Amino acid sequence: MSRSKQTDEKKQARKAVGERRSPFASGMDFETSEAYNVLRTNIILSLPHKRRGNIVGTTSSAPHEGKSYTSVNLSYALAKNGSRTLLVSADMRKPTVEGYYEVPLSPGLSNLLVGSVPQDSLMEVIRPLPEYSENLFLLPAGDIPPNPSELLGSQNMGDLLRKLATLFDFIIVDLPPVTTVVDPVAVSPNLDGMLVV
């Protein structure tokens, strides 16, 4: 087999894996897609009527219940509806959101919170996702820290979310399961709402 043919096959395989992991790119059925649109509408109606800066955390009671999948699809539904939407990968223990978009973990949230990346470089760390929607952006988790709950409950996290709230209509914060670690509780004072999957 020729080298160029092998390269083409590898590209196709990577594309297929990306499409399989990216829920909307793979052609979700109507009922599932509509369920996320209903969820989007319910969240919009249940939050304070702010034009910008609605911050919603997503968590679950246990691992493998679909909270990251829900975060990805909810963010997409909000962005497709015309809202400038940021998905924050804040499960710094087992980040998975980045895999849906084939985006590297670092630099990201943890780097901003510990100061290894200055907050004035924020827009260099946030990744636009125009192949999905011109309104969709991702803040990756960053390097895995030894103290995620302390970082999420820190003043730096509150300051960062307030700054992000001036830049985006919706911020979806993907968090670890609430019954396994304290991370969702630590960040909750800075959220407008919490979705438990």
Go through the PLM ranges and name each one.
Residues 1-43:
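Acidic-aromatic/histidine active-site loop/patch
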Residues 19-20, 39, 112, 138-139, ...:
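Conserved beta-strand/loop subsegment of P-loop NTPase cores
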Residues 26-28, 106-117, 143-153, 196-197:
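Flexible beta-alpha connector loops of hexameric P-loop NTPases
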Residues 31-99:
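Walker A/P-loop phosphate-binding motif and the immediately C-terminal alpha-helix
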Residues 57-59, 88, 140-141, 173-174, ...:
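Conserved beta-strand segments of the P-loop GTPase G domain that flank and frequently precede/overlap
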Residues 78-138:
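Phosphate-binding loop that captures ATP/GTP phosphates
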Residues 128, 141-182:
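Phosphate-binding/switch loop-helix module in NTP-utilizing enzymes
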Residues 177-197:
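Conserved P-loop NTPase nucleotide-binding/switch module
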